From Swiss-Prot:
Catalyzes the stereoinversion of LL-2,6-diaminopimelate (L,L-DAP) to meso-diaminopimelate (meso-DAP), a precursor of L-lysine and an essential component of the bacterial peptidoglycan. The lineage of its organism: Bacteria, Pseudomonadati, Pseudomonadota, Gammaproteobacteria, Enterobacterales. Pathway: Amino-acid biosynthesis; L-lysine biosynthesis via DAP pathway; DL-2,6-diaminopimelate from LL-2,6-diaminopimelate: step 1/1. It comes from Cronobacter sakazakii (strain ATCC BAA-894). This is Diaminopimelate epimerase. The gene is dapF. Keywords: Amino-acid biosynthesis, Cytoplasm, Isomerase, Lysine biosynthesis. Pfam families: DAP_epimerase.
Length: 274
């Protein structure tokens, strides 16, 4: 099986063309491939499949390193767009794909940065999903004897956003896993730790569901900005600095889609016997 190794700001992926190759991945096989010592090593596996709908170009599947399939990965979407062009699967700059829970439009700019229409952020708790009696801008939660104030949003996957004074000292490794698997998130959640620098600039670290802390989380950056705008902390265009680099997020508010722009890097091509 041929594959490519790619990354978006250090969030790394094994990308596989299932349009011209016959492939099947069991959860156990994905876990073995994800092993950084005995496999290829990656945060997520991205699979390019033929479209299910004639109006679309491809179907986009995402698997975490633990073998679980998820519906959204923003950094992966940028790599997906670069991959299908690099491999000659399309020459379009505007690429329409379906995912497990919807559709996305990926635009490859002239400078090879990729702009992703992430759809409209969803704050309704039952749709995140998040257990709450009603929608709030800020929720009060309890985790390991401490009170946590957070915002909750879905960007096609669930995000919990916690504002902190300094991301460098944020309790990502301790509070992250507790919140990820909190009983109020029936499908678990990605946990963002957000430091607001000013209305147009945040710093962010993300403990990703099923992957742990990563160098960057595209949907996490989108979720953090959406929550920040909803809470009145941020403007409509925001620079997000993650450990792996910078993303630019734009959202005009309710009724509008959110856009993420950032890089996608091809590292190498490989061949593996399964």
């Amino acid at each position: 099986m041929q594959f490519s190794k790619m990354h978006g700001l250090g969030n790394d992926f094994m990308v596989v063309d299932a349009v011209t190759q016959n492939v099947f991945f069991s959860p156990d096989m994905i876990r073995r491939l994800a092993d950084r010592h005995q496999g290829v090593g990656f945060d997520q596996l991205l699979v390019v499949e033929p479209p299910y709908d004639p109006d679309l170009d491809f179907h986009y599947r995402i698997f975490n390193a633990d073998g679980s399939e998820v519906a959204q990965c923003g950094n992966g979407a940028r790599c997906f767009a670069r991959f299908v062009r690099l491999k000659g699967l399309t020459n379009k700059r505007e690429i329409r794909v379906s995912t497990a829970n919807g559709r996305m439009v990926l635009t490859v700019n002239e400078d090879e940065q990729v702009r992703v229409n992430m759809g409209e952020p969803v704050f309704e708790p039952s749709l995140v999903p998040f257990r709450a009696n009603k929608a709030e801008k800020t929720y009060i939660m309890r985790a390991a004897e401490q009170t946590v104030l957070c915002g909750v949003v879905s960007m096609g996957n669930p995000h919990c956003v916690i504002q902190v004074d300094d991301v460098a000292t944020a309790p990502v490794e301790t509070l992250g896993p507790l919140m990820e698997s909190h009983e109020r998130f029936p499908e678990r959640a990605n946990i963002g730790f957000m430091q607001v620098m000013n209305t147009e600039h945040i710093r962010l670290r993300v403990f990703e569901r099923g992957a742990g802390e990563t160098q960057a989380c595209g949907s996490g950056a989108c979720g953090a900005v959406a929550v920040g705008i909803q809470q009145g902390l941020l403007a409509a265009q925001v620079r997000v600095d993650l450990p792996g680099g910078r993303l630019d997020i734009a959202w005009k508010g309710p009724g509008n889609p959110l856009f993420m722009t950032g890089p996608a890097t091809h590292v190498y091509d490989g061949f593996i016997h399964l």
